[in-house]
Amino acid sequence: MLVVQMPFSFPMAHFILFVFTVSTIFHVQQRLAKIQAMWELPVQIPVLASTSKALGPSQLRGMWTINAIGRLGNQMGEYATLYALAKMNGRPAFIPAQMHSTLAPIFRITLPVLHSATASRIPWQNYHLNDWMEEEYRHIPGEYVRFTGYPCSWTFYHHLRQEILQEFTLHDHVREEAQKFLRGLQVNGSQPGTFVGVHVRRGDYVHVMPKVWKGVVADRRYLQQALDWFRARYSSPIFVVTSNGMAWCRENIDTSHGDVVFAGDGIEGSPAKDFALLTQCNHTIMTIGTFGIWAAYLTGGDTIYLANYTLPDSPFLKIFKPEAAFLPEWTGIAADLSPLLKH
């Protein structure tokens, strides 16, 4: 084939150079636009989830958490309050790693865990909570909120009772160990008809209540009244006593009926055994403290609690409302305040 070569004209060279330049500028602009868009994307917060349940970021914006303060009862209250308020306000809830370490070995909790390294990079808005529900808590502003305080009131979460009970379901091995112990108990050689968990809070409260809060802890008389209340209403009850002051309990709880068992180990650093025993009973006798409150809440049944255990001018009543701590259907037995009046 004959190929005729035409001379390359100067105007054609200009045209091709123009097309190449325009194309290059266009692609550079497109690339810069993509890079800028990537810079403007929000930082993705890595979390370690303790469950397979995903909180879709397209559905819930921001991140709410709560300070992990206190021992088991306090942290259960903090967890339940965070769970309820986050749901109420349409925000995703994440728990601190410390709280996960306290609760996860005992319960089947589902809230995802926030790494401490990630938490330290977030511009948190601290939000203090009273120990009772307030109307303003239904409309809390802010996407990155960290609750503070010691909330442990049914007024926050009782409308979600079944969900809270599900969150605080015992792991199988924890529950089975407690049930195995209870199955082996007898009352005067017979199988008990009713199991009543008894939690006696002693420890630091013995000194803190009278010296700081103008209050008292449960005494021998209160416990006798509480046990007799159940003896009058149930056939062959057995009382399963747990305490962080078991020596005091052995000296002050009447065992002449043959229906009292001193159980648990009273070790505050590893409370799973005591707590599981209490919740596997049918009813509860508590004294003071969030440990007993939660045991009663999870157990259901009848609950006897120590009522009016501070003087009317106690500073404790500024941060604690009995009506927000004890369910209305629970039965209170008034404390003996005479030791405080002697001083």
From Swiss-Prot:
Keyword vocabulary terms for this entry: Glycoprotein, Glycosyltransferase, Golgi apparatus, Lipid metabolism, Membrane, Signal-anchor, Transferase, Transmembrane, Transmembrane helix
Top-level class of the enzyme under EC nomenclature: transferase
Lumenal-side positions: 29-343
Disulfide bond entries: none
Transmembrane residue ranges: 15-28
Glycosites: N188, N282, N308
Pathway, per record: Protein modification; protein glycosylation
Gene Ontology terms: cellular component: Golgi cisterna membrane
Subcellular location as annotated: Golgi apparatus, Golgi stack membrane
Cytoplasmic side: 1-14
Membrane topology: Single-pass type II membrane protein
Major subcellular location class: Golgi
GO process annotations (BP): fucosylation; glycolipid metabolic process; oligosaccharide biosynthetic process; protein glycosylation; regulation of cell adhesion; regulation of endothelial cell proliferation
Function: Catalyzes the transfer of L-fucose, from a guanosine diphosphate-beta-L-fucose, to the terminal galactose on both O- and N-linked glycans chains of cell surface glycoproteins and glycolipids and the resulting epitope regulates several processes such as cell-cell interaction including host-microbe interaction, cell surface expression and cell proliferation. Preferentially fucosylates gangliosides GA1 and GM1 in the antrum, cecum and colon and in the female reproductive organs.
Family note: Belongs to the glycosyltransferase 11 family.
Name of the protein in question: Galactoside alpha-(1,2)-fucosyltransferase 2
Name of the gene: FUT2
